[in-house]
UniProtKB/Swiss-Prot annotation:
Probable transcription factor. Residues 248-263 have a biased composition (Polar residues). It comes from Arabidopsis thaliana. It holds the Pfam family C2CH-3rd_BIRD-IDD. One of its GO terms (cellular component) is nucleus. PANTHER family: PROTEIN INDETERMINATE-DOMAIN 13-RELATED (PTHR10593:SF231), SERINE/THREONINE-PROTEIN KINASE RIO (PTHR10593). Keywords: DNA-binding, Metal-binding, Nucleus, Phosphoprotein, Repeat, Transcription, Transcription regulation, Zinc, Zinc-finger. The modification Phosphoserine is found at residue 54. This is Protein indeterminate-domain 13.
Length: 450
């Protein structure tokens, strides 16, 4: 006898209800079979008769027919009752304890189905019919509201009763009739939306480009539109309004020197190796697009000289003569530099490629025609030439219409170009109208011309 049993016997001698309660609690709990095991025990019929019906006979509406009128019945009992009307001998099956009827189970006629195994057979003829229709049959019944199809008419009727009464709509537009399905889908949809927002929130380094759009003046608004192929050349914005100039996503403000902000390059933080490599890659992409934009603007200004108002760049011209725009503390210098690079070190890393391009210019010689100038302009992507030409287009203008359009290098014969050259190349030779392009390129790269 175990210790637990002896404890129980000693406690039963007392009549105290508390001790009796303790005695009952010490009894070992009864083990109840799990639902899965109970289901398997019910479905398992070791002595049952296994019946295999063909798909045709299984899906037949009537399996029993009258010999006289050929009327069909689904059950044999109904046929026997029908025979009484024809005065035929009929007999109903009666249950007796003497002759025990074997249980009948039905297997699925589809060999690949799990219920084709006799151990997984279904014990109801109606159940095997519905199973075969749902899993292997044709769905003939369609809901008029949600267009769902069903193979069993009872399922279709049950669906019609609740269809449209309860709807759970997700933000993505999906409808659910069950709340659990909606909750599981919503959790997945929220995670997907969060990841998508993180992806699209990353700013693109080339996002500052848009269509060459507007040149506005206070008195004479002029709209210039140029249709560009956005997939190949990108877009750019040029907005001039009084003392504010916006070019290719960068804003320049011409104000007094006392109101100027610190240089953008001076405020930039030291770059990391990864950001420096990205800056070099984005530098050349921006320069290639900039060349295309400036060439288009040049061509458009040559063809439409008369549409520009002569006083549209007056403020910029006055500032050039005063020497404010190209002063060392002007934020325009930093803004123009930041247009082509994120910091000064990125420009220095790209100097090797610029030197190679300048050597090509020195070898090819001076362009002799406008076509050659256009070709040479497309080849030169150095930030030196791009910045020079950018300033000549956007920050200078003359009363003479012929001087509105600068050459592609921006090295005109005006005194403003001399100031521009001294600002950009303080240690180089002075720039004059008689300078040759190969000599200029050779001077920059340190090559001596014969």
């Amino acid at each position: 006898m175990t210790a637990s049993h002896s404890l129980a016997l000693s406690m039963t001698k007392s009549t105290s209800p508390l001790i009796l309660t303790l005695t009952l609690s010490l009894q070992p709990p009864l083990k109840h079979p799990r639902k899965r095991e109970t289901f398997q025990e019910i479905q398992a019929y070791p002595n049952a008769e296994v019946i295999s019906l063909s798909p045709k006979s299984l899906m037949a509406t009537n399996r029993f027919f009258c010999e006289i009128c050929n009327k069909g019945f689904q059950r044999e009992q109904n046929l026997q009752l029908h025979k009484r009307g024809h005065n035929l001998p009929w007999k109903l099956k009666q249950k007796t304890n003497k002759n025990q009827v074997k249980k009948k189970v039905y297997i699925c006629p589809e060999k690949s189905c799990v219920h084709h195994d006799p151990a997984r057979a279904l014990g109801d003829l109606t159940g095997i019919k519905k199973h075969f229709s749902r899993k292997h049959g044709e769905k003939k019944w369609k809901c008029d509201k949600c267009s769902k199809k069903y193979a069993v008419i009872s399922d279709w009727k049950a669906h019609n009763k609740i269809c449209g009464s309860r709807e759970f709509r997700c933000d993505c537009g999906t409808l659910f009739s069950r709340k659990d399905s909606f909750i599981s889908h919503r959790s997945f949809c929220d995670v997907l939306a969060e990841e998508s927002s993180k992806f699209f929130s990353v700013p693109s380094p080339l996002a500052a480009n848009s269509t060459i759009a507007t040149v506005t003046d206070t008195n004479n608004p002029i709209l210039i539109q140029s249709q560009l192929d956005q997939s190949s050349t990108g877009t750019a914005d040029l907005n001039v309004n009084n003392n504010h100039t916006t070019l290719f996503g960068q804003k320049f403000t011409n104000s007094n020197p006392t109101q100027q902000q610190p240089n953008a390059l001076a405020l930039s933080s030291p770059p990391s190796p990864r950001s420096t490599s990205d800056s070099v890659h984005n530098l050349w992409k921006l320069q290639e697009e900039e060349c295309a934009h400036q060439w288009l603007l040049n061509e458009y200004m040559n063809n439409n000289k008369n549409i520009f108002h002569k006083g549209i760049f007056k403020n910029q011209e006055d500032e050039i003569k005063k020497g404010n725009i190209y002063s060392g503390s002007n934020p325009t210098d930093g803004n123009i530099a930041s247009l082509f690079s994120y910091n000064q070190e990125a420009v220095n890393m790209a100097s090797f490629s610029a030197t190679t391009l300048l050597q090509k210019v020195a070898q090819t010689g001076t362009p002799s025609s406008s076509e050659t100038s256009t070709t040479m302009f497309g080849q030169m992507t150095s930030s030196i030439f791009n910045n020079t030409m950018l300033n000549s287009y956007c920050l200078t203008a003359k009363n003479n219409e012929e001087e509105l359009t600068r050459d592609f290098l921006g090295v005109g014969s005006s005194e403003d170009q001399q100031r521009l050259h001294r600002h950009r190349f303080p240690s180089s030779v002075p720039l004059t109208a008689n300078h040759d392009i190969p000599k200029l390129a050779a001077t920059i790269v340190g090559r001596k011309q014969p």
